[in-house]
A protein has these predicted regions:
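GNAT-family acyltransferases
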Residues: 1-107, 111-115, 128-136, 145-149, ...
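Conserved active-site alpha-helix within GNAT-family acetyltransferase domains
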Residues: 119, 123, 149-166
Length: 180
């Protein structure tokens, strides 16, 4: 665990024009799962009552935690999306993350709370993560999947430079991909 925490200190906060993407630490993931309010302190951000997004189930947190401890090279692949206001106060608006699929391919997922959707935050956060991942040693492509009926999610992938790559893993899903 000590090595994991040392590695996290070297993971930079990703910054976009409007957002800050903070690497998820084991402590943050535990606080998030506990739903007791400690996440606000750890992120130094307001956590809306609507947190977490519908897709953000406890087994997802457990998987991210296990992945981070088993594969320290993936530190920084999972991030909370924070939006600072004009005074620098931050609000948690979503999350983005990536899982190695093997052979240099990382699959990303992203979610934005409903109150912050349709403002470009998901695209901005996913785009920053895609760029970050493609700079990492050993990563040759980034993919994402969604249901074919989810036009907004497909737009996010396309705006991140991904192109249609065929059917996804589950029935009714499609996969998009961006090569290095």
């Amino acid at each position: 665990m000590r090595g994991l925490l040392r590695r996290l200190r070297g993971v930079p906060e990703l910054k976009t024009r409007r957002l800050r993407l903070v690497a998820m630490t084991p402590e943050m993931l535990e606080a998030d799962a506990a739903r007791e309010g400690r996440l606000t302190t750890l992120l130094k951000a307001r956590v809306p009552a609507a947190w977490p997004p519908a897709e953000w189930e406890l087994h997802v947190l457990a998987t991210i935690f296990a992945n981070a401890t088993a594969k320290p090279e993936s530190m920084g692949w999972h991030r909370y999306t924070l939006m600072p206001d004009r005074l620098g106060r931050r609000t948690l608006v979503g999350c983005v993350g990536g899982f190695p699929r093997g052979d240099g391919v990382v699959e990303i997922g992203y979610s934005t709370l409903p109150a912050f959707q349709r403002k470009g935050y998901g695209t901005e956060a996913a785009g920053a993560l895609v760029e970050y991942l493609l700079e990492q040693e050993g990563v040759r492509a980034v993919t994402a999947q969604t249901f074919a009926s989810m036009a907004e999610s497909i737009k996010v992938m396309e705006r991140c430079g991904m192109v249609f790559a065929g059917e996804g893993d589950d029935p009714g899903t499609v996969r998009y991909r961006r090569e290095r």
